[in-house]
Curated annotation (Swiss-Prot):
It comes from Staphylococcus saprophyticus subsp. saprophyticus (strain ATCC 15305 / DSM 20229 / NCIMB 8711 / NCTC 7292 / S-41). HAMAP family: Methyltr_PrmA. It catalyses: L-lysyl-[protein] + 3 S-adenosyl-L-methionine = N(6),N(6),N(6)-trimethyl-L-lysyl-[protein] + 3 S-adenosyl-L-homocysteine + 3 H(+). Its EC number is 2.1.1.-. Keywords: Cytoplasm, Methyltransferase, S-adenosyl-L-methionine, Transferase. GO terms for biological process: methylation. Methylates ribosomal protein L11. It is found in: Cytoplasm. The gene is prmA. This is Ribosomal protein L11 methyltransferase.
Length: 312
């Protein structure tokens, strides 16, 4: 089966909205090429970034690439997608462009690797592609070896970075953790590296569960993490000290009450995948459910919210 790569150039302000929209349309992977990446003063360990070819990046704004299988990507699908993009209120139509190309199956399987290099995702965590050799800087650095596949994030998205920082801040080695929508398994691995002994990783997508298990093996923690298919927290009967969910805002909205009921007293709900425009509604829902909001962090139009269950 072949794949269609769509490439959308747009202004920075709408890139999170476009990413959300593409995921809602069922994209199997999203790549963001930001014109500002060529001007940032990165630290030495990001040295790979200087080898980037400026011709591969837009001169202005961002290029968002998404991948759809050829069976799904019909003419009607394409027209609806383009119209949905043009309906974005703050889209700069003068900058906007939409292109597409067909990618063969064997090329698609390796396309995403061009964008994935070792990088420091938070104070403690460094993400390392499984096919690259990386020298740990010091004993405090915690390396997560990752082979996410095209369908799952490489950990460089702002929502993942914010979740990793929240895990550093709020997760203790004595806690129990449930990771909802685990994807590549990166957040479960992070919890394990902090010494957490009881971790459960859920995903409604069985392929995600398989990929997560493979990454758990790469990080020598398959014995410590229970990875199973699961539809949010609807059927969860166990209690946990921390619930983590880095998924889309409308899905988070569905699970807030269940997250509260799944937590032990004083437990934390760490959640991201939320665009700026939707975070206030999420915060208000969390408060109504009984959460005390302990932190709200923003990064490039994305938001990470941490709530605490302060009473039973």
């Amino acid at each position: 089966m072949n794949w269609t790569e769509v490439a959308i150039v747009a202004n920075h302000e709408v890139s999170p909205i476009i990413t959300n929209l593409l995921e809602d349309y069922g994209s199997n992977g999203v790549v963001i090429e930001d014109s500002e990446d060529l001007t940032h003063d990165f630290e030495d360990k990001y040295g790979e970034i200087y080898a980037l070819n400026a011709e591969d990046y837009p001169t202005q704004g961002v290029r968002v690439k998404a991948y759809f299988n050829e069976i799904k990507y019909t003419k009607d699908f394409q027209e609806k997608l383009i119209q949905s993009l043009k309906d974005i209120e703050s889209l700069d139509l003068d900058l906007f462009s939409f292109d597409e190309q067909t990618i063969r199956e064997q090329d698609w399987e390796n396309e995403w690797k061009h964008y994935f290099h070792p990088f420091r995702a938070s104070e403690k965590f460094t993400i390392v592609p499984s096919w690259e050799t990386y020298q740990q800087e010091d004993d405090s650095e915690l390396c997560i070896e990752l082979d996410p596949g095209m369908a799952f994030g490489t950990g460089d998205h702002p929502t993942t970075s914010m979740c990793l920082k929240a895990i550093e801040a709020y997760v203790k080695s004595s806690d129990s953790v449930i990771d909802v929508g685990t994807g590549s398994g990166i957040l479960s691995i992070a919890a394990h590296l902090l010494g957490v002994k009881r971790i459960k990783a859920l995903d409604v997508d069985e392929m995600a569960v398989r990929v997560a298990k493979e990454n758990f093996q790469k990080n020598n923690c398959e014995y410590a993490i229970e990875a199973v298919p699961g539809n949010l927290l609807k059927e969860e009967t166990e209690k946990f000290d921390v619930v983590i969910a880095n998924i889309l805002a409308h899905i988070i909205e569905e699970m807030i009450d269940d997250a509260y009921n799944t937590l032990n007293k004083d437990g934390y709900f760490i959640t991201s995948g939320i665009i700026e425009e939707k975070h206030e509604a999420i915060v208000e829902h969390m408060k109504r459910s009984g959460f005390e909001i302990v932190s709200i962090n923003h990064d490039n139009s994305w938001v990470c919210i941490v709530g605490q269950k302060v009473s039973d």
